[in-house]
């Protein structure tokens, strides 16, 4: 894996099964995904292709042996909705590689385009490599049931909850939170069953020092995206951006609440762009995912 190395192309079919399986995995059954809204094309969840973009490395590398790498950071941009029946072409490239605290990190970018060459989405992923089963150097995270005994993190929220974004939305406004109960089936379906990993196989997870299979960090990102899709509407799918870091584990049985607060409003041509702080936290109040997001209004 060297900087500049190209990845792909790979093709992804956006069919009924893919849309509905993803809806189950992230517990988001918006009618726009399940049946389509009257007079409109049926679409998929905004983050429907997030795992496909993350695994564009499969075009060059076979990592079906259970290697337990850790996903550290994720950026995602939305340009156009993903529509039922499309064939999306994925391409990517490695853009950075570095060592920090004796661990190798690699960053790669990937994008999806439709049959007409229109950009649908773009992702930038950073992962910590080289954690094969049985050789995890860092202490294993506490099991989910133990995490619930920790003192909650302080979350300062003072503004009103605003259902829908507009040019008059004030700074400090809260986005309506999204609450999810995570089950093992969702974790496995989200990741896919084509390989054993710390997300799908208990034996592999325990060999890597984990107490249970662990949810992909991307799942928390999809929950935040759901909240922001409800808040912004179509401008989230056509101009939304999110950048998050995955800072604590999520296990089956956890309850995850995803929230956002409007931090700033900036001019963007004839429109404004709302900048938000975003995060997901477990039932103990421990943040598991943190970052920023924005979209035009």
Task: Give the location of each predicted region.
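Hot-dog-fold acyl-thioester-processing enzymes
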Residues: 1-73, 134-238
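HotDog/MaoC-like acyl-thioester-processing domains
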Residues: 73, 78-177, 246, 250-297
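Catalytic-pocket segment enriched in acidic/His residues
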Residues: 212, 219-265, 281-283
